């Protein structure tokens, strides 16, 4: 458009000059002071128009997010340049009007002075050539490549021009702000995931991010939309102990085979989970005494609604009160759907609700703790009539009365974050939901060959000696049963 305006102006002005007889007969003498002045002004206008054209492309192509990134993670020189440009680029529409206005003035003034120096045909050719080469192509090519550096070096000129053009540029810029609005500076989650995938090595575009890095970043972005029900282990696939069962050799073998650090404890019905048992607390329990599960220390297991976001669960797990929770199906729905709960939670208190005193009974002077089993003795993450960190409206009573549908652990949350299953030495299934098996035979044989298993069988076979020196013998069938118990299929729940 600038080229067309320049050509049209040159033709019009040439025609006017010829009709008035000012420049139709003879041009300004070459080499005179007037000729040098007009030539200098023409060169200045071409140079000025080129700077305005280049700054228009260079500055307007720098987004606010890009400048923020450069200020935080760029080189010292880039940080300095981005900090100088950022206040100017914030006024995008006013900056655009200022640069275009100054560029148009320079372009329209160029034919006037060229017409004084040459005839109409030469003025048109020179105007088009200068404007195309030095006013458009070269400046925009340079500013496309070095927009940040050029913009930082000419930011003083831009500030002066914005001040001079303020009466015109400011009102027009405000109107554009109201009509068009501001550009959305931040990326959405889907855009961030696409940006990360583009920078991966697998994309083949020169990115440096490995597959694991892109997977973890994508998992972290998706974690806010996932709920406890998606990551939990179903209660049917969970290994748990009855509170009235005995910690005999068979029970100890099952616990050893599973390899869990925590085991849920239920009363009567496996869905009536009342607490959890730390396996390390069984170090002092002797299997031959057949101690009841209710006689050992049972910790409270917190309860979470099935639609609770995984980030909220992760935050509670990080407080250290528990790394296992029972997932319950609460009647009714929360007022705020999980997919819209994207704001970061800021908690004024550093204390977790899980650190409340346990509702336990102590019998006599014994240190063993017995849980009241009349009702599931769990505790939710939220207190009565309080919303969860992301605005959930579930009350503690509703969560307490909800049906337990699964168990979720810190490992389950990490697996969703990594988007890969974490398989340890005792796992039989890579994915419990899809029933994808690990090498079950190899896992079972490795457990059977373990020295700890042989010692456990030897201790059970020899038993404890009584006061008369008699030894309790264990039949061979019971030993086979014990070995089968240890090597039976494993169902992991943490």
Swiss-Prot record:
Glycan-linked positions: 350, 385
Region of interest (Disordered), ranges: 459-494
Single GO cellular component term: membrane
Keyword annotations of the record: CBS domain, Glycoprotein, Membrane, Repeat, Transmembrane, Transmembrane helix
Protein name as catalogued: DUF21 domain-containing protein At4g14240
InterPro entries, per the entry: ACDP, CBS_dom_sf, CNNM, Ion_transp-like_CBS
Cytoplasmic side: 65-93, 143-159
Chief place of localization: membrane
Bilayer topology annotation: Multi-pass membrane protein
UniProt cross-references to SUPFAM superfamilies, sorted A to Z: CBS-domain pair
């Amino acid at each position: 458009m600038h080229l067309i305006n320049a050509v049209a102006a040159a033709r019009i002005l040439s025609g006017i000059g010829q009709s008035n007889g000012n420049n139709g007969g003879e041009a300004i003498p070459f080499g005179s002071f007037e000729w040098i002045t007009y030539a200098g002004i023409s060169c200045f206008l071409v140079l000025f128009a080129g700077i305005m054209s280049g700054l228009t492309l260079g500055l307007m192509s720098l987004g606010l997010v890009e400048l923020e990134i450069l200020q935080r993670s760029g080189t010292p020189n880039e940080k300095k340049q981005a900090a100088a440009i950022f206040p100017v680029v914030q006024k995008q529409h006013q900056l655009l009007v200022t640069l275009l206005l100054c560029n148009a003035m320079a372009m329209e003034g160029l034919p006037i002075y060229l017409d004084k120096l040459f005839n109409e045909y030469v003025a048109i050719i020179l105007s088009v050539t200068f404007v195309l080469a030095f006013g458009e192509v070269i400046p925009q090519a340079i500013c496309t490549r070095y927009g940040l550096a050029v913009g930082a070096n000419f930011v003083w000129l831009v500030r002066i021009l914005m001040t001079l053009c303020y009466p015109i540029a400011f009102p027009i810029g405000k109107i554009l702000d109201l009509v068009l609005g501001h550009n959305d500076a931040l990326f959405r989650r889907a855009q961030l995931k696409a940006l990360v995938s583009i920078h991966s090595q697998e994309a083949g575009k020169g990115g440096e991010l490995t597959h694991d890095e892109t997977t973890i970043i994508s998992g972290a972005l998706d974690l806010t939309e996932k709920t406890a029900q998606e990551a939990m282990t179903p209660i049917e696939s969970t290994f748990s102990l009855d509170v009235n069962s005995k910690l005999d050799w068979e029970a100890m073998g099952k616990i050893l085979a599973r390899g869990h650090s925590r085991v849920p404890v239920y009363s009567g019905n496996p869905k009536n989970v009342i607490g959890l048992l730390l396996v390390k607390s069984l170090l002092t329990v002797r299997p031959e005494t057949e101690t009841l599960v209710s006689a050992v220390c049972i910790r409270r297991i917190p309860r979470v609604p099935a639609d609770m976001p995984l980030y909220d669960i992760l935050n509670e797990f990080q407080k250290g009160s528990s790394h296992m929770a029972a997932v319950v199906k609460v009647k009714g729905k929360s007022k705020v759907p999980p997919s819209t709960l994207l704001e970061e939670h800021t908690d004024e208190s550093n204390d977790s609700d899980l650190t409340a005193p346990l509702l336990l009974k102590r019998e006599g002077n014994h240190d063993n703790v017995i849980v009241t089993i009349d009702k599931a003795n769990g505790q939710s993450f939220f207190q009565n009539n309080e919303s969860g960190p992301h605005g959930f409206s579930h009350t503690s009573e509703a969560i307490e009365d909800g049906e337990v549908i699964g168990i979720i652990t810190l490992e389950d949350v990490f697996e969703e974050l990594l988007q890969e299953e974490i398989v340890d030495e005792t796992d039989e299934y890579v994915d419990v939901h899809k029933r994808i098996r690990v090498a079950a035979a190899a896992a079972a044989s490795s457990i059977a060959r373990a020295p700890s298993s042989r010692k456990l069988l030897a201790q059970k076979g020899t038993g404890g000696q009584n006061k008369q020196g008699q030894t309790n013998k264990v039949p061979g069938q019971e030993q086979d049963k014990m070995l089968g118990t240890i090597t039976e299929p494993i169902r992991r729940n943490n």
